[in-house]
């Protein structure tokens, strides 16, 4: 595995460090809709581009969740972050679960926004064909976007999301990532993890629904929480940014509250 410092931007200067990982269809710009309203005094966010995306579009690699997790941990090392929380959207949810498995003692809290389970996401043959061909077929990407947001989003938004996806991802990497996040099962490596874990699901997302999270995320993490956002599909950063921020930051902030309680008990 070649060494790579993931391209990233830092936002905020708070004491609670957070690394946020994008999904299959976008680079770190996926988080642009929430940036203006984050609590940058309490948190410092590192938004990254995985290999094959954004500023790392031309980077070589195997384009697997394990490689992505190793890159995330290497970035934390480079930033000097011994302890940090993780956020991952969709495919990025699988990457951050891999990172938790690789460095469990370093992760404060983990958040999956419509996360792919650590068991992968087996697809029926027709859906697999739709997803696999999306690497070179913009119409397939648009169909996936439309289906996973309940068929309720305007054409202009769908078209813009497709353009962004095409511009900011390498087709070969895009296709290779699918094999990893959909086909690999590593849930035995995170099953029983004591790390507090939040899953955020969209009520309009038929693929990575609250029901699926109950059967996976909620079973594997003893300290799991699940929040379902109404009138929201797979892309909560675009569809419900303020609700997402409040949900995620309240969860992350509870880590400091828990530490305060522990300090009080020791006193």
Language model features with spans:
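Gly/Ala-rich beta-loop-alpha elbow adjacent to hydrolase catalytic centers
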Residues: 88, 92, 96
